[in-house]
Amino acid sequence: MRKQRQTHGEEVANVLTHGAGMLFGLTAIVVLMIAGIRTGDPWVIGSFAVYALCMTSSYVTSTFYHAASDPKRKCQLRRWDHSAIYLHIAGTYTPFTLVALRDEGFWGWGLFITVWLAAVIGVWFSFRRMKKKDNLKTVCYLLMSWVVIIAFKPLIDVFQRTDSMYVLYWLIGGGLFYSLGTIFFFLDKYKYMHSAWHLFEIGRASCR
């Protein structure tokens, strides 16, 4: 059974971990935009921008949520925090679907639409009043993170043609980081487990 509230010390750790993630995200925006602009490809630039902004928004909302002390404000920010996770996951898929898989028939746009539709539905659910929805949302996060396996074969084909199989390994690593991290999420009745989940989330973002 999950804790309803985190202790002050735990919230400080939560702020520090995702505060570090926020700085990482801001740095990533600069690095990715420079890399994208150098390619001169508008698809690369646009998808990199979407990913960087979605990732950073996730860390920003989480940091503000955990830093809030007023119960009413914290409740409101919690919804934004959970919504941003859906956007973070969808943003992660954007470069793969609109750059790597765009010319692979259904796979690029099909996967892009599927993931972003799931994210929009997830955001909608995050603002609905539902009992015991945290575990359901975590399952949704996991399913979204691993839906890429349906496009595994075309991804491998693209990476082999472009001699960039290492990208696939990083992608798998990100999924493993997030999957292992959910163990700590479900164990957050124990102190500082939520902060540990944050670290795995940052590890996932570093891979992808």
What is the predicted role of each segment?
Residues 1-208:
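Multi-pass alpha-helical transmembrane bundles in non-GPCR membrane proteins
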